[in-house]
């Protein structure tokens, strides 16, 4: 789930964007924001679990950018990154941005075949920038 500013940034320079949100109320808010920002035609909203969504996207193209903002401290970042390591929805040019709690350890990403490009810390969270490959 991205906030409105992040959604606009994701779509602005892309032909399409896919949003995944399990919570129906949050989906309503996202849909309203996409309509308000006149980006509804450029975005697809999947109201489902992230793993179900990832499986449904297989074979439908490669993403330029994947932005993850999962609930903190549930290790969903790792679960998604483990899935993506063999997924057809990304390649070596796909940028993966993960938002996480400041205390989340990403020491395992190289073992999964990712290269950490950058890390940016804020007051309460951080963004980790990754790509596939060493």
Please report, for each region that a protein language model flagged, where it lies by residue:
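C-terminal lobe and adjacent flexible extensions of AdoMet/dcAdoMet transferase-like proteins
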Residues: 132-134
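S-adenosylmethionine
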Residues: 54-126
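Short, conserved active-site loop motifs that form the nucleotide-linked donor/cofactor pocket
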Residues: 7, 43, 94
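Residue-level signal for inorganic ion chemistry
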Residues: 8, 30, 69, 96, ...
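Short beta-strand element of Class I
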Residues: 15-18
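S-adenosyl-L-methionine
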Residues: 20-61
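Single conserved hydrophobic/aromatic residue that forms the stacking wall/gate
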Residues: 1-11
């Amino acid at each position: 789930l991205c906030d409105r500013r992040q959604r606009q940034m994701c779509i602005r320079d892309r032909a399409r964007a896919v949003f995944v949100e399990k919570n129906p109320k949050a989906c309503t808010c996202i849909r309203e924001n996409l309509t308000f920002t006149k980006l509804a035609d450029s975005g697809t909203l999947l109201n489902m679990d992230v793993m179900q969504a990832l499986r449904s996207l297989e074979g439908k193209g490669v993403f330029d950018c994947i932005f993850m903002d999962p609930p903190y401290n549930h290790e969903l970042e790792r679960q998604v990154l483990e899935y993506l390591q063999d997924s057809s929805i990304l390649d070596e040019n796909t940028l993966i941005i993960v938002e996480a709690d400041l205390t989340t350890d990403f020491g395992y990403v190289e073992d999964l075949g990712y290269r950490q490009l950058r890390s940016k810390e804020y007051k309460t969270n951080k963004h980790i920038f990754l790509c596939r490959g060493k």
